[in-house]
């Protein structure tokens, strides 16, 4: 595990619930006001098990995200920090892909946090 792995940077927030040679599945839980340390995710699918609001920050850019329970979103590989800026706990599952991206990454700044595609 690398030093920027979320289970290393924030072991009280991230927990591995399944892993094999192709994917790793993380459970994430936090409370209002909680912040993560800088960490890295590979390409992933996030499934929200609770509604939440959070701020995602990458370098000098940040975005506020509000999601409902039961949503599934793609998250391209990125290093970031996150903060629960809402008034509810966050509960989500990340399915991290271990296989390399099949196509080149599009030019420009990648989206922050989860996207619909």
Language-model regions: role of each:
Residues 8, 13-18, 102-103:
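Local beta-strand/beta-hairpin segments that build beta-sheet-rich folds
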Residues 21, 60-78:
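Short acidic-glycine-tyrosine-enriched beta hairpin
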Residues 24-40, 57-59, 76:
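Conserved short histidine dyad/triad with adjacent acidic residue
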Residues 40-55:
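Short, conserved beta-strand element in jelly-roll/cupin
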Residues 51, 77-100:
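Ligand-binding loop in jelly-roll beta-barrel domains
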């Amino acid at each position: 595990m690398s030093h920027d792995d979320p289970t290393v940077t924030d072991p009280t927030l991230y927990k591995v619930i399944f892993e094999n040679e192709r994917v790793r599945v993380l459970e994430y839980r936090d409370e209002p006001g909680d912040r993560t340390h800088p960490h890295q995710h590979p390409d992933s699918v996030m499934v929200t098990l609770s509604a939440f609001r959070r701020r995602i920050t990458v370098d000098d850019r940040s975005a506020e995200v509000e999601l409902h329970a039961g949503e599934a979103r793609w998250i391209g590989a990125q290093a970031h920090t996150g903060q629960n800026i809402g008034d509810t706990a966050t509960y989500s599952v990340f399915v991290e892909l271990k296989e390399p991206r099949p196509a080149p990454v599009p030019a420009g700044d990648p989206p922050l946090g989860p996207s619909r595609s």
